[in-house]
């Protein structure tokens, strides 16, 4: 966009990227240093919260802009950091508004990791009604069906799903496979990347699936799902 807007400008912006495993902070730090040697003017990421704090410290010291897009529990606003992720308090209030509007008397919070539970802890502590916490784990077949089946047996119908985007679509498909996608069931998905998932498989189930937009922070209803 900048290059197109200023085609005759004295410089052009050239993006460079690299992939690194989620917990490999050392490689993230080393690759960032190599970028800085090339004259990099800004760093976006990493997406992993495990590595981001190390990169943030380096870029603050070098006074290089650092842009984050992930949830950050500490939200340390340093001189060169810009975090584009909605503040946890704003998301918590949005989730509370949704469940209160629907007048849910109880809800099952389905999560897939300790990090997921930490993201939802403000909601759990603020919700004045009954919240059941259920973690889903892979069974010996490599699926979530065992965990989901046990949740189904409780008879619950109102669910909040807090899962990583990497597994979210599979969790929804397997919930449908075990009979948790009917007109009686309601889902609120907290992952802000829900729009990247194809929900066509659930359009005739009668299930209400609701997500929250990252950009406008308004509730989007997927009618007829």
Model segments located where?
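Signal peptide-proximal N-terminal region
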Residues: 1-15
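Extracellular/periplasmic ligand-binding modules, especially the Venus flytrap/periplasmic-binding
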Residues: 164-167, 215-225
